[in-house]
């Protein structure tokens, strides 16, 4: 499912996409995806893309409830110590196992991404250290009581140490280091134009709905609407307010607020 986190907005989509039977979904977006590096720039389009390629220890539902991500469970052991258990059998897109050591690497990387214009370090400000208990168990020590730690970790995409240890942001953008554990794998990123994803069939026990997903950057509102009406794309975001009545009246289309 294509999800967008953040402020409420509207989507217009072709009714043909609703049963999710199509093999290829194309979405035209108002704002560009600027990087595949999930720790480089905290911006809504980048976060939306990262939801599909990477996973977080803890995820959020559409109603902002916390739900298991890479972690199947978490609990406080004391006021300044949390235990997280990773999902057995979780794998990266290259087939390698996701381990607690990848989480340690991720937490160390987040505040140290070179030239980041606005990253995610603030979400980890309470973390003092992480202990690997075994490959699927880790203990996170905090500097002070941190009851919101699971909520903060819902913002942090976990990346592979193997592929990220020597990688720069450019290596994520090229695809070399963009090896996630999410439902889709990154196929191609053309900055200012499009991002292409392909389904990862090894994700959990679930099969993602579309085989391929393309995000196109179309900043002109009229161009997005025209592309939708012509059938060139299946979904657009932020349709012009003046066009919403017309789009709602078209039986081939649906308009939704998220």
Residues of each region from the PLM?
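Ligand-site clamp/hinge motif
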Residues: 200-246, 258
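Aromatic- and charge-enriched surface segment that lines or borders ligand/interaction sites
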Residues: 72-116, 139, 224-227
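Short, well-ordered beta-strand elements
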Residues: 23-32, 72, 81-84, 103-107, ...
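N-terminal lobe/hinge region of extracytoplasmic solute-binding protein
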Residues: 28-78, 108, 115, 177-180
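Gly/Pro-rich hinge or "lid" segments in bacterial periplasmic/extracellular proteins
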Residues: 154-208, 212, 222, 230
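Surface-exposed binding/hinge segments that line
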Residues: 75, 121-163
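N-terminal signal peptide c-region/cleavage motif recognized by signal peptidases
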Residues: 15-19
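Ligand-binding "clamshell"
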Residues: 23, 245-258
């Amino acid at each position: 499912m294509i999800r967008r986190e953040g402020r409420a907005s509207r989507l217009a989509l072709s009714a043909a996409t609703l049963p999710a039977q199509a093999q290829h979904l194309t979405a035209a977006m108002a704002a560009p995806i600027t990087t595949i590096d999930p720790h480089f720039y905290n911006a809504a389009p980048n976060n939306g893309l990262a939801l599909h390629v990477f996973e977080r220890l803890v995820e959020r539902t559409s109603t902002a409830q916390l739900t298991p991500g890479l972690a199947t469970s978490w609990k406080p052991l004391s006021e300044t110590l949390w235990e997280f258990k990773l999902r057995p059998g979780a794998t990266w897109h290259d087939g390698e196992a996701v381990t607690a050591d990848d989480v340690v690497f991720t937490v160390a990387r987040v505040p140290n991404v070179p030239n980041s214009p606005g990253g995610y370090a603030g979400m980890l400000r309470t973390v003092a250290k992480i202990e690997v208990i075994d490959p699927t168990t880790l203990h996170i020590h905090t500097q002070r009581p941190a009851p919101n730690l699971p909520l903060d970790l819902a913002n942090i995409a976990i990346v592979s140490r193997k592929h990220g240890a020597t990688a720069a942001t450019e290596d994520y953008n090229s695809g070399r280091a963009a090896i996630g554990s999410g439902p889709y794998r990154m196929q191609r990123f053309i900055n200012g134009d499009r991002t292409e994803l392909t389904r990862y069939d090894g994700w959990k026990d679930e099969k993602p709905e579309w085989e391929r997903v393309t995000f196109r950057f179309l900043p002109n509102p009229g161009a997005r609407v025209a592309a939708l009406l012509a059938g060139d794309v299946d979904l657009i975001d932020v349709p012009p307010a003046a066009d919403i009545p017309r789009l709602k009246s078209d039986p081939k289309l649906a308009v939704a607020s998220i």
